[in-house]
Regions:
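Active-site cofactor/substrate anionic-group-binding motifs, chiefly glycine-
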Residues: 44-97
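Flexible, acidic/Gly-rich N-terminal and inter-domain linker regions that tether
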Residues: 1-64
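Core AdoMet radical
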Residues: 73-89, 95-116, 121-160
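Short amphipathic alpha-helical segments, especially helix-boundary/capping motifs
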Residues: 11-16, 65-69, 97-101, 121-123
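A broad detector of the eukaryotic-type serine/threonine protein kinase catalytic domain
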Residues: 19, 24, 71-74, 130
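Generic recognition of cysteine residues
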Residues: 9, 25, 91-92, 132
């Protein structure tokens, strides 16, 4: 098994059967070696730094019905909410006071949160906290909207 793990580390790929064998392995020495190699690869790729981000779930309302998602439109068990701009700004204020320097505004594709509203919210956050990074994850938008968000101060956009 050690040979298989070494090959995985060097080639970054195995065949299906080899993956199954690794997943089903119960040998303590093999699992220790696998854990060691995984930690080594993680440290080489990402280092030892940990980055803390202030994640603000601004809405769980969504027009989409993605089966993997807990906030999909058809899920009637979810109590829906949308934060006001004032609440979002207050969350950023509190986060800034606690030392957060990256804010992630995340939520479903809520038609009530227009591109203009998002752009204005980002601009207000950026003007108050110019030393902070702003990341958005609010579903699919137009290219023009992404550009407007960037001009307003958002530096990243996560698209799932």
């Amino acid at each position: 098994m050690k040979h298989t793990i070494d090959r995985l580390c060097s080639q970054h790929s195995l065949d299906r059967q080899e993956y199954l064998e690794l997943l089903q392995c119960n040998d303590v020495d093999t699992l220790d070696y696998l854990r060691f190699q995984a930690q080594k690869a993680t440290l080489e790729r990402f280092g030892r730094d940990v980055y803390v981000r202030g994640l603000i779930e601004i809405t769980n309302e969504c027009r989409n019905n993605c089966l993997y998602c807990g906030i999909r439109q058809a899920n009637k068990m979810v109590a829906r909410y949308s934060l006001s701009q004032a609440t979002i700004l207050d969350c950023c204020r509190q986060g800034y006071e606690l030392g957060f320097r990256t804010f992630v505004l995340q939520g479903g594709e809520n038609p009530q949160m227009t591109d203009e509203w998002v752009e204005d919210t980002v601009a207000r956050i950026h003007s108050r906290y110019p030393d902070c990074a702003i990341t958005l994850s609010l579903g699919e938008r137009s290219l023009q909207a992404y550009k407007a968000f960037f001009r307003a101060g958002a530096s990243r956009y996560l698209l799932r």
